[in-house]
Amino acid sequence: MMLAFLLASAIPADVRAQRGGISYPQLRAQNVAPGLYLDHHTIPAPEGEDNVWMSFRFGYDVLQFRRIDEDNRREEAPQSARFMATAELQVQVYKVDAEFDADRLENQRPFKTLNWSGRAYADSFEDTQQATRFLDGFASFAATEPGRYAYRVRVSTDGTNRPLRRNLRRFMVPDFDKPGQQNLSDEAEEGNAFPVYLVEPASDTSATRFQLSSYGRSVMYAQNFGVILQLPEEGQADDYKVVIERLGAQEEQVFEHSLSPSDIREAGMLQIRPQANQSLQIELLEPEAGNQPEYRLAYLEIPNEEFRNSRFMLKLMQGDKLISRREFRNLWIDIPSSLLNIDVALSMMRIIVDDETFNRLRSGNEAERIRKFYAFWEERDPEPEREYNPLMVEFYTRVDEAFDRFSSLQVPGYETDQGKTYIRFGSPQDIERRLPSDGPAREIWTYENREFIFEATTGFGDYKLVDRRTR
């Protein structure tokens, strides 16, 4: 995919000027996937059976892999595996009250302690660095009574303790026999009396098994997902609606759906089933013969491919009354680094636009710059029905790749002649390297209808564009 059709004139080389005191290299260093995804799920269950399930997922890039020698190869290791990593996780669960004080937990005995360990295998060193490959796990316990709980998490990989940005979380175990009737004096708990489950989209309209989301409190950016909501016993389907609001500086409602009978599912019981790969499924079980359904639920597919990369609040409403809610954020694991900061993103556009356009895009306050940025790329979006813009993503992905491939100690890769050529035209069809005895090394990049000739300026891989030809 070529981006050169956006060019209007020769492009100045300097794109280092940034607003807000942050540079692209700083963003690149900060652009690290979360690595550990953690969530909890509460379900109705017979007395004594587990009704709280913890799911967690480790990205391969945060694990500490070591090479497998034949004398320490475990029986379960695939024959193709060359690297192995271990992870351990401990969850300490506490019963708390509305006046919850985190400091008091230091002297409080846990209600329950859960321990888990697992191993991950990789065939190559490149696989060990993948943020999109995962080691999954789960743990569960029986909460003896409804109410407020908190849990603390400790993680280690290959025996090394790993600090977590947030290792203490609170949650509510509803009274499934009397849903919605808890004394929720703490305003922060409003909307937590009925559970909301984020799931993978159903394969068909009659599905009764759903894969629970494995990304903590997040869903994958630009991918639709499903949601299962428990409904109160009273009221017709069309008494309820689901709304989604985008949170943050540009807060607005982005989705509304009034429930219909086709959205409703009935179940005698809900059950969570671990899968062979350690992920979790939730199943809606039929009532036993002669019994009425115990639970009324709604399933919706959420058009997340239409939503921006942001945080959202999903609410189930009965008229003006809040029944349940669930915050989620879009997770873009491999987001191009420039897109983490509007001014860095705009500065990179100097590579593909003329000076007049560049100066216009960068003028105004932050809200105006964001608006103009989106408008620019929306005009060039090959898939306007989706929020995800593949042309924009391709451009900023090439900026990252140019930085990785062509940077020197003095110049970031996107400012080099080779880097800018790569960003505008993509990977060449062929690269010919010449080492003449009487001159500097040369590289000839060949595309379908043009060639670029680069000449080494130092002995450290720095190349300058010296000629271009149309074929």
Specify the residue positions occupied by each region the protein language model found.
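Bacterial N-terminal signal peptides
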Residues: 1-9
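Boundary at the C-terminal end of the N-terminal hydrophobic targeting segment
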Residues: 8-19
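Intrinsically disordered, low-complexity terminal regions enriched in Ser/Thr/Pro/Gly
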Residues: 18-304, 323-332
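Residues within mature, well-folded domains
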Residues: 43-48, 219-224, 233-236, 247-307, ...
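Extracellular recognition modules
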Residues: 152-154, 313-317
